[in-house]
Amino acid sequence: MLLSSLAALLVLAGSCRKAEEPQVNKGRLEVYKDFPSKYIPSRTVRVWLPEGYTSDKQYDVLYMHDGQMLFDARTSWNRQEWGIDEAMDSLQASGKIRPTIVIAIDNTLNRIGEFCPDDIVEYLPEGSDVYPFLTAQGNDYLRFIVEELKPFIDSTYATYPEREHTWLMGSSCGGLISSYALCKYPEVFAGAACLSTHCTLAFPRPDKPDSAVMAAYRRYLTEHLAVNSAKLYMDNGDKTLDAYYGEAQAAINASLRAAGWDSAHFAYQYFPGAAHCEDDWQARLPIPLSFLLE
C-alpha cells in the first residue's frame, strides 16, 4: 500500500483537471490554452509577469514544469502550490534576484513519459524494470521547449534570449528532465534547479534496491555535463518519496565534486523532515531561486 501511494505521487504530481484557472497574488498571468506542438500533445502554458513588467527593459526567463501546481492551491489536485509568484515577487522587490518572468508548462497524463530522459534509459542495465508501461519522450518534450515554446516567448515578451539568461526548474521527475536539459542543450540553458529529483529512475523498491539503475542517472550527468559549465542546484528531504533518494543523491554529489564542480556552479541542500510535496518545495523555494538568479 505504501509503495502504491508513493508511486502515485509520480503520476499525479502536477496533474489537475479543474476547470477554474489559477489566480496569482503577485504579478499577473497570461494564459495560452492548447499551445500547439508537433512533438507532444498541446497543453496550457502560463506566463507569469512580475509587477511593473514593461517592454522597456529585458527579463531573464525561468521555464518550469507541472504548471498546474505553481500558483494556486485552490485549483491543484492536492490543494498545495509552489507559491512561485509570491517568491519571485519578494526576491525581485528586494533586489536579491534579477528581473525574471516564469513560463509555467502544464503536464499531461503522460507526465512520467515526457519527463523521462531518453538517453539515460540507454545507460540502464539490460532487463531493468524501469518505466515498464511508458516509452521515454523526454527528447520530444525538450524539443517542444527549445524549438517551439522558447522562440514564441522571446518574440512575444521582453526577454534576454541568450543562454546566460535562460533557466529551468522542476521537482521529482521535473528535476530529472531539468538536469537532462542542461546536458542536451548546453547552448540554450545556463542552469537548472532540481528539487527532490527522482534520481532513482524507477518506482521505489526498498525491498529490491538496484544500484545499477540508480547509477544510470549519475553516470549520464557526470559524462555529459561539462564541469562548471552551468549552474546546477539539487536537494532532497527524507520523508515520503524523498526517503528513497538519499543514497543515489549522495553518489551524484560525490561524483560531481570529484569531477571538479565548485560551489559557485553546483549546490546541494538537505532538508530533514521535508516530504515530496509542494508545501515543502515552497518553503525552500527562495534558496534555489537565489542560487540561479542572483
What are these regions (language model features)?
Residues M1-K26:
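Bacterial Sec-dependent N-terminal signal peptides
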Residues K18-E294:
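Non-catalytic cap/lid and distal C-terminal segments of serine-dependent acyl enzymes
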